[in-house]
Amino acid sequence: MRTGRVTQTIWNRSVKKQIQKGNRNSTGKTAWEESSSELISDEKDFVWSSTSVSGKAPAQVKYAVIKSAGDLAAKRVRPTAVSVQILFPESSDEQELKDIMRILTEICEETGLSITCVQAESAEYVLRPVIQITAVGVKENPKQQMKKWIPGTEIILCGYTGLEGTLRLVDEAEA
């Protein structure tokens, strides 16, 4: 396979057929979908979004949180919590984890998100830190909201999405 995401054709053949068998209340069944949901009842829909980033800068975790939260906001879901998994190269030290956690805590406090789980491990096959963020939220009355699109509620590169791009530009300019 080539580097990066698999193509939609490969995803349909190898993934979609497997997960489609008994799961009728879920969404997010395309290779390019950034979030998915599980309809619990007519009143509640649990929605989550995952983002992976890698790189040397501990600030990468900030972009991942903003991206995951932004994906939920684009679906009219207020993010409430994040779960974090971090893979480090064996050459990493504890200070890298502390730096990532400091930034993670700051961004979660700013955005009102709680941190529900943090897993960190090192592996010999990892060349630079890889951070996986999963944000979750609950959409109230999902069926009713899908029917009502109110003018002026469109998201056009603002909020978390616009913030992520702006922060990346600022960090690059300062470097």
Task: Report the location of each language-model feature.
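Helix-biased detector of long, well-ordered alpha-helical tracts
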Residues: M1-A175
